[in-house]
Amino acid sequence: MHTTYSDGLGNPREVVETAIARGLDVIAVTDHDSVAGALAARELVHKEGYPLGVIVGSEVTMARGVHLLALFVEERLPMFEPAARTVARIAALGGVALAPHPLSRLTPSPGRRLIEGLLAEGLPLLGVETVNPSPAGRPGERARSLNKGWGLAEFGGSDAHFLPHIGAAYTLFPGRSAADFRRALEARATVARRADEPLARIPLRDYARQSGRSMILNPAQKLLRVNR
């Protein structure tokens, strides 16, 4: 899920409190090319004693703008690098690499050729998102079918940019902690699920605000990071 540290509309406190209200045990905060929101959320949980695990991560922009999730990595990763280098770097830092909204044409996403190329090279891509309630997640069923051959851990993610969408998709796993979730990924013991209730409707003004952050603010922040 995303916070105001990239193109989400909820700040870390709002994201944490909404996740708890939704009954989630663990969340992964994955702002675009930034771990600041995730670190802030985890610090808040520790300070306030909230009953929630926070996985620090980011949604990394690789070559050609393709996105990849890096979980359990507490530093910002270089942008626009080849996928193979990014996956190897994530592993070297002790993290796990996951393919979000695979096969989607609505946002730069890992395609079949990229995923199978990484696996052919023996690179440690660990999981693939098979449930994502956003429009970008529509190819999820096809990804689930292809994953019978890939053998990756499946996971569900809300990809929430709006607070009401938190928990719209989730991952079942044995245990209740971030460490349990990681072990389940490694054991291919995760199950992707979508919430029973329909996806919450978002007011047009909020879509406009989020689009502005996504199309103007977030790219400007990325440009500053690249030029530093």
Q: Language model features by range: what are they?
A:
Residues 51, 93-98:
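Short beta-strand/loop segments at the ligand-binding rim of alpha/beta enzyme cores
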Residues 28-31, 98-99, 129:
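Conserved beta-strand positions in the central sheet of alpha/beta enzyme cores
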Residues 100-104:
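Acidic/Gly/His-enriched mid-domain segments of enzyme catalytic cores or analogous surface patches
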Residues 25:
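Short acidic/polar active-site loop segments enriched in Thr and Asp
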Residues 78-80, 98:
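Short secondary-structure capping/junction motifs at helix and strand boundaries
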Residues 1-18, 22, 36-49, 56-77, ...:
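Charged catalytic cores and adjacent phosphate/nucleic-acid-binding surfaces used
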Residues 28, 53-55:
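Short, conserved beta-strand segments within well-ordered enzyme catalytic domains
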